[in-house]
């Protein structure tokens, strides 16, 4: 835990394990997408957005089928295409692959889930009060997650705390780069026009904290129930917090 006041002019937040419980993502969102991917494709196959995703997934499948026997090449006919995409997406979900078009498809599936009221986005109780204080200090708040920007917005628009999107300035996903690569954080700094040293990044993942720190950002590791354990080396290098209140 940290007791010193942290000075920052932008707040960059991971989602899963940081402001949202890992169990919500792992035990609710991912299984929902896993179970409903085929049904969604059946209902929305001819939608232009769906077709773009399918084509992107076809290219990825062609590449990965060379080295992964569980990945099938996606056939052209509608019925076979849906079968193949469903099989691949379920395989990638099991492997926790960070594939941008798959994340986009998951986002579309979750959009329906939120609209139907099947799910509500979980946030820890300390999150919204702290973000309101940060916003009142005129400090912009950004989200950076491997989930698509679309999925991020859905979660915060349909959270158990209500619509939180009004206090969030922007969102980043794997289109800006992978979270374990320092260049991604450099790009975010350039995009929001705030020097890296003035950005505070909160995450529960050591590799992400390392990448952000390498890019010059301030970092803290967030400790939440159910999160993976942290090495003593990481705790010493980045420090930990157990509540967002500790950044105030």
UniProtKB/Swiss-Prot annotation:
InterPro entries: Enolase-ppase_E1, ENOPH1_eukaryotes, HAD-like_sf, HAD-SF_hydro_IA, HAD_sf. GO terms for biological process: L-methionine salvage from methylthioadenosine. Its cofactor is Mg(2+). Mg(2+) binds at residues 14, 16, 204. Its EC number is 3.1.3.77. It comes from the Eukaryota. It catalyses: 5-methylsulfanyl-2,3-dioxopentyl phosphate + H2O = 1,2-dihydroxy-5-(methylsulfanyl)pent-1-en-3-one + phosphate. Keywords: Amino-acid biosynthesis, Cytoplasm, Hydrolase, Magnesium, Metal-binding, Methionine biosynthesis, Nucleus. Pathway: Amino-acid biosynthesis; L-methionine biosynthesis via salvage pathway; L-methionine from S-methyl-5-thio-alpha-D-ribose 1-phosphate: step 3/6; Amino-acid biosynthesis; L-methionine biosynthesis via salvage pathway; L-methionine from S-methyl-5-thio-alpha-D-ribose 1-phosphate: step 4/6. GO terms for molecular function: acireductone synthase activity; magnesium ion binding. Binds 1 Mg(2+) ion per subunit. Bifunctional enzyme that catalyzes the enolization of 2,3-diketo-5-methylthiopentyl-1-phosphate (DK-MTP-1-P) into the intermediate 2-hydroxy-3-keto-5-methylthiopentenyl-1-phosphate (HK-MTPenyl-1-P), which is then dephosphorylated to form the acireductone 1,2-dihydroxy-3-keto-5-methylthiopentene (DHK-MTPene). This is Enolase-phosphatase E1.
């Amino acid at each position: 835990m940290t007791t010193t006041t942290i000075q920052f002019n932008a707040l960059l937040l991971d989602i899963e394990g940081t402001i949202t419980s890992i169990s919500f993502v792992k035990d609710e969102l991912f299984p929902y997408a896993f179970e409903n991917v085929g049904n969604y494709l059946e209902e929305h196959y001819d939608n232009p957005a769906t077709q773009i995703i399918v084509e992107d997934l076809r290219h990825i499948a062609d590449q990965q089928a060379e080295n992964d026997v569980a990945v099938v090449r996606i056939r052209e006919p509608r019925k076979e295409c849906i079968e193949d995409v469903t099989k691949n997406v379920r395989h990638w979900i099991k492997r926790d692959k960070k594939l941008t078009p798959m994340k986009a498809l998951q986002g579309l599936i979750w959009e329906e889930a939120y609209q139907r009221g099947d799910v509500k986005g979980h946030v820890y109780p300390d999150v919204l009060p702290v973000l309101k204080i940060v916003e009142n200090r005129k400090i912009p708040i950004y989200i950076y997650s491997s989930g698509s920007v679309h999925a991020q917005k859905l979660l915060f628009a349909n959270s158990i705390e209500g619509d939180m999107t009004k206090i969030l300035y922007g969102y980043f996903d794997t289109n800006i780069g992978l979270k374990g690569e320092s260049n991604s954080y450099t790009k975010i700094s350039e995009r929001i026009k705030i020097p890296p040293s003035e950005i505070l990044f909160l995450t529960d993942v050591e590799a992400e904290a390392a990448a952000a720190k390498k890019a010059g950002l301030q970092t803290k590791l967030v400790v939440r129930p159910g999160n993976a354990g942290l090495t003593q080396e990481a705790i010493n290098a980045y420090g930990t917090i157990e509540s967002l209140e500790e950044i105030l």
